[in-house]
Amino acid sequence: MSNAKILATGKSVPDSIFTNEDLEKMVETSDSWITSRTGIKERRIADENTATSHLSVQAAEIALNKSGIEPADLDMIIVATVTPDMAFPSTACLVQDKLGADQACAFDLEAACTGFLYGLRIASQFIATDTHKYILVIGSETLSKIVDWEDRNTCVLFGDGAGAAVLGPVENGEEDKGLISFDLGADGSKGELLQQPAGGSLKPATLETVSSKEHFIKMNGNEVFKFAVKVIGDTTEKALKKIDKTTEDIDLFIPHQANQRIIDSATNRLGISKEKTFVNLQNYGNMSAASIPVALDEAIEENLIKEDDLVALVGFGGGLTWGSCLIKW
C-alpha cells in the first residue's frame, strides 16, 4: 500500500466582492462589528447564473493543468458540497461531463465544512489499495444562495468559492510523504446547531417552508463556537498521536476559515503560533467545504510550504462533523 499525495491544487472564486460596507446598507450591522466578531472583511458572491458545478470545473481545470494530468486519466471525482446544483444528478457527475473525464466514476459527499477532508480520506484509501491512480477532490459551495440576507447573524459569515486537488500515489523513495495521518468524526446529536431545515424529504419545499425561511442556513453560533474550539484541538492531537508527532512538529496549520476568534482560541489551546497558522477568511468569509482547499492552494501559491514540511489541515462543520489530515510535503 502506498500513500496518496497532492499533485496540484487550484481555486476559483466569483469576481463579485461583497464588503462589510455593502452589508451595512442591508442589515443593522457595521464593519467594526463584523470584523471584531469574525475577522471577515469581504466575501465573494456568485451571480444568478453561476452554480456550484461552474466554480468546481474552473478550480479543477487549474489543478489539472498544474498537475499535468489529463481529464481522461482521472479514475474518480469527488465533490464535497452542501450546495449542489440540484438534488440529482450529483454535482460531481456534472463536473465529470464538463471536464470530459469519461473514465472517472463520480459522486458527491456531504460533510459540510469538513467535506474536503472526508474527500481526501476516501481518495487516499482508493489510491493506497492501487484500485485507482488519479483522483480529483473538490470542495465547492455557493452558500450565498441559501443565506438569509435579512439575518445579520448569518449573512455576514458566508461566501462562495471552490478549491480542487489532484491526488496520485507517492513515487519510489517518497514512502514517508503524502497524506500520512487522518482523524475524522461526527456527532449527529448536535445536528440542529447548524442546518438547512427544509428542502429534503423530511420537509419538502412548500409555500409554507419558503415563507418561514426554512431553506436558509440556521445556526446556533455560541454552541458552534464552543464545539469548534474543542474539536479542533482534539482532532489535531489525535492525528498527530497516530504518527508520534506533536504540535511542535507542525510547520503550517491550515484550519477551516470560519471565524478568527475560533482560530485564535483553538491555536492558543494547541500552542501553535500565528506565524504557523494560515488565515485568509478576511477575504472570503466561510466557504464551507471550499474553505480548506482554497486556503491550501493560496498557501502553496505564496510559497509557504516547502519540501518535507508537515502541514495540518483541520476542519469542523455541520453534522456536526470534524476532521484533520496531516501531510508530509
Curated annotation (Swiss-Prot):
Pathway it works in: Lipid metabolism; fatty acid biosynthesis
Catalytic EC class: transferase
Key words of the record: Acyltransferase, Cytoplasm, Fatty acid biosynthesis, Fatty acid metabolism, Lipid biosynthesis, Lipid metabolism, Multifunctional enzyme, Transferase
Recorded GO MF terms: 3-oxoacyl-[acyl-carrier-protein] synthase activity; beta-ketoacyl-acyl-carrier-protein synthase III activity
GO cellular component, one term: cytoplasm
GO BP terms, alphabetized: fatty acid biosynthetic process
Cell location: Cytoplasm
Catalytic activity: malonyl-[ACP] + acetyl-CoA + H(+) = 3-oxobutanoyl-[ACP] + CO2 + CoA
Residues at the active site: 113, 256, 286
Keyword Transferase among record annotations: yes
Pfam families the record matches: ACP_syn_III, ACP_syn_III_C
This enzyme's EC code(s): 2.3.1.180
SUPFAM superfamilies in alphabetical order: Thiolase-like (SSF53901)
Region (ACP-binding): 257-261
Similarity remark: Belongs to the thiolase-like superfamily. FabH family.
Cited function: Catalyzes the condensation reaction of fatty acid synthesis by the addition to an acyl acceptor of two carbons from malonyl-ACP. Catalyzes the first condensation reaction which initiates fatty acid synthesis and may therefore play a role in governing the total rate of fatty acid production. Possesses both acetoacetyl-ACP synthase and acetyl transacylase activities. Its substrate specificity determines the biosynthesis of branched-chain and/or straight-chain of fatty acids.
Description of how the protein assembles with itself and partners: Homodimer.
Domain notes: The last Arg residue of the ACP-binding site is essential for the weak association between ACP/AcpP and FabH.
Protein name: Beta-ketoacyl-[acyl-carrier-protein] synthase III
Gene source species: Natranaerobius thermophilus (strain ATCC BAA-1301 / DSM 18059 / JW/NM-WN-LF)
